[in-house]
Amino acid sequence: MFGQGRLGQAMALLLFLGMTAALARGCLQCDPNFAEKFSFYRHHVNLKSWWVGDIPVSGMLLSDWIQNTMKELHLAIPAEITRKKLYQVAEAVYQRMDQLYQGKMYFPGYFPNELRAIFREQVRLIQNAIIESRIDCQRHCGIYQYETISCSNCTDSHVICFGYYCKSSAQWESAVQGLLKYINTWHKQDEKMRTTPAFLSQNIKCLEPQHLVNLTLEKVSECLTQH
């Protein structure tokens, strides 16, 4: 397919987990059932272990769940997740937590260790959900947008990408024309107001800001097919 080489490179970039923690609160708190569920978990934590030392440790794990989630995500892309995937992750977490809370008191150390295991699994699910959506987006042909929730403030957001999965030269040409039109419109926007899509990447030299003014259809197509 046209542009598949570039798609592969983009997928590899998306799978890279950067080590700079995003300035956000988390993702799971954006689920409408989160407050009720975690309020229950916190208020019943003192009934889950025979050892009194487990109670403050478990309580801290639950209280810091959201902020610790963002510290562990380490994503090199913005933490924006689709509602469908968010609800799927939340349901998986609640299911494991509910099962844990259905048991009677546990022997010392077991309960906080199980909480840590659920936490790690939640982080992995969120990482995969965000990255998979980005990869799926790039499997389209041309400019594509999908709706998300921003994990930083739980507001509606969207992700815009450029897909390289074009099945013919005509589709590819149309995709490049759409990209050029988008770039021209983007370039005219107020720098303080606009956001920079991931595909306007420094890894693609011709799409760096200083080159956008002089872009032509031929230059864009040539540049993209070289990556």
Curated annotation (Swiss-Prot):
Extent of the signal sequence: 1-24
Pfam families named among the record's database cross-references: IZUMO
Q: Does the keyword rRNA-binding apply?
A: no
Keyword list (alphabetical) reads: Glycoprotein, Secreted, Signal
Highest taxon above the source species: Eukaryota
Give coiled-coil spans as residue ranges.
none
Where does the UniProt annotation locate this protein?
Secreted
Query: Which residues does the record list as glycosylated?
Result: 153, 214
Q: Name one GO cellular component term.
A: extracellular region
Reply yes or no: does the keyword Transmembrane helix apply.
Answer: no
Which InterPro entries does this entry report, sorted A to Z? IZUMO, Izumo_fusion
Q: Which family does it belong to?
A: Belongs to the Izumo family.
**Any remaining note in the record?**
Izumo is the name of a Japanese shrine to marriage.
Record protein name field: Izumo sperm-egg fusion protein 4
Task: Report the gene name.
Answer: Izumo4
